[in-house]
């Protein structure tokens, strides 16, 4: 089954201010896929949030992948901007929504292309 996964910055602050911020996130994403090979169909990075369409082989794979991705991104972002100890980057745990119909999957894929 495919899932729509998303997360936002705390109080909808900006996660990605400049192109280097997007590139840094994508480097973490490449590392995450190398560590936990989660099939990703599409993703979309917005200034204050992101969306993914994925098809995990297990529920554990989904949780492990996005936990590692958000934790690592947060740590590296704080290190880069010297904001360690200033609080959370994300509003909380990522959200997941199962896509049980082809129409739902197609709609989210169009949104995240």
Indicate where each model-derived feature is located.
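Short catalytic/metal-binding and nucleic-acid-binding patches
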Residues: 1-113
């Amino acid at each position: 089954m495919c899932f729509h996964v998303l997360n936002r910055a705390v109080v909808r602050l900006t996660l990605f201010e400049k192109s280097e911020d997007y590139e840094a996130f994508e480097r973490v994403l490449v590392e995450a896929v190398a560590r936990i090979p989660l099939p990703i169909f599409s993703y979309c990075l917005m200034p204050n949030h992101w969306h993914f369409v994925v098809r995990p082989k297990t529920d554990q794979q989904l949780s492990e992948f996005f936990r590692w991705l958000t934790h690592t991104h947060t740590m590296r972002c704080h290190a880069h901007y010297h904001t360690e100890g200033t609080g959370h980057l994300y509003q909380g745990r990522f959200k997941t929504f199962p896509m049980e119909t082809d129409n739902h999957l197609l709609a989210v894929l169009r949104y995240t292309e």
